[in-house]
């Protein structure tokens, strides 16, 4: 096994750990889930570039008669990238004391201001950061509003 294979195994393990955390562990942290809303995907171009570069590496490895283990590891990396960027849906998960957005826990008392833009983007102003929440279904904004009113 080469150093390249070890690095690929590390990247695959990191992506797998992230996918498992995002799908199974995060919804169970910080109490029961009150509301889970699907968000729009961001960075589709980045994902196409990533999977395309891995496909080029697979092609290069196959045409130069590289190790089969490396080809399989690159294929697994491409599949993990495809899952994370294209199949998995990003979510905002509301709990009793706060919410998870982009895998970061944010407590409700950190919200200083909330606005709704004309194109349906919920803007939450925190102390030093602004969150742009783009929901997949525009009707979910009303659910978020009701939940925040009940919990404040």
UniProtKB/Swiss-Prot annotation:
<keyword id="KW-1003">Cell membrane</keyword>
<comment type="similarity">
    <text>Belongs to the UPF0266 family.</text>
</comment>
<keyword id="KW-0997">Cell inner membrane</keyword>
<keyword id="KW-0812">Transmembrane</keyword>
<keyword id="KW-1133">Transmembrane helix</keyword>
<dbReference type="Pfam" id="PF06173">
    <property type="entry name" value="DUF986"/>
</dbReference>
<protein>
    <recommendedName>
        <fullName>UPF0266 membrane protein YobD</fullName>
    </recommendedName>
</protein>
<feature type="transmembrane region" description="Helical">
    <location>
        <begin position="45"/>
        <end position="65"/>
    </location>
</feature>
<dbReference type="GO" id="GO:0005886">
    <property type="term" value="C:plasma membrane"/>
</dbReference>
<keyword id="KW-0472">Membrane</keyword>
<dbReference type="InterPro" id="IPR009328">
    <property type="entry name" value="DUF986"/>
</dbReference>
<feature type="transmembrane region" description="Helical">
    <location>
        <begin position="67"/>
        <end position="87"/>
    </location>
</feature>
<feature type="transmembrane region" description="Helical">
    <location>
        <begin position="6"/>
        <end position="26"/>
    </location>
</feature>
């Amino acid at each position: 096994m080469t150093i390249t294979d070890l690095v690929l195994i590390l990247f695959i393990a990191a992506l797998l750990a992230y996918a498992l955390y995002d799908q199974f562990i995060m919804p169970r942290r910080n109490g029961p889930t009150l509301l889970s809303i699907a968000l729009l995907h961001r960075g589709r171009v980045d994902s196409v570039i990533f999977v395309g570069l891995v496909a080029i590496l697979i092609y290069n490895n196959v045409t130069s008669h590289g190790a089969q283990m490396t080809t399989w590891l690159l294929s697994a990396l491409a599949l993990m990238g495809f899952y994370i960027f294209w199949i998995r849906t990003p979510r905002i998960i509301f709990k009793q004391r706060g919410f998870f957005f982009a895998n970061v826990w944010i407590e409700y008392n950190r919200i200083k201001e909330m606005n709704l833009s004309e194109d349906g983007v919920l803007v939450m102003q925190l102390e030093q950061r602004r969150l742009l929440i783009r929901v997949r279904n525009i009707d979910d904004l009303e659910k978020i509003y009701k939940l925040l009113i009940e919990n404040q």
